[in-house]
Amino acid sequence: IHLLINHWPSRSGGEQKTSAYREAAGKLNKKIIDSLQQLSVNAKIITMGDLNDGPHNKSIKVALGAKGKKTAVAPHEIFNPFEALLSKGLGTIAHQDAWDVFDQIMLTGTWLSSDYSTWQYWKAGIFQRNYLIQTQGKYKGYPLRHSLTEVGYSDHFPVYVYLIREGK
């Protein structure tokens, strides 16, 4: 199992002006994944983190080549389960009342087999418990951030995946 932990460049300065930096991060991730797969065709790889782009941005769809439908993913390709969550209106971060999914966990197609004698991907989610949500004011419903005047957690909701296998 190989884990790539990421924090891609910020959108500070404007989404379009900074897009090339995140696209470069996506290309580097793809290059690392390709290298690992050359060493082991059946490598199980997970790339995850705060990517500062959503599942439909060029850094994810083109540079990394992630696909949102399990059935369209070959073993050497990358599956992004968070694309489906965004299409359902869910998100990890909100800006001007628009949700996006900047925090993602993506897996190579080697995690998508129906052979549960080895670890396989089952499902993904966004962790949104009440204690993580702003309950009042301008940002009601947003992640409860930490500030000088309030105790909170983060401006992003956490994400998770379930990896399962058959018991012995």
Predicted regions and their residues:
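His/acidic metal-ligating clusters that form di-metal
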Residues: 25-48
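Second-shell loop/turn segments in exported
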Residues: 12-22, 47-48, 90-95, 147-148
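Beta-strand-turn-beta hairpins that frame and shape the catalytic cleft
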Residues: 1-12, 165-168
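A shared catalytic/ligand-binding motif for oxyanion handling
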Residues: 6, 20-23, 42
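Metal-dependent phosphoester-hydrolase catalytic domains
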Residues: 37-43, 53-168
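Active-site metal-binding loops of divalent metal-dependent hydrolases
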Residues: 8, 50-51
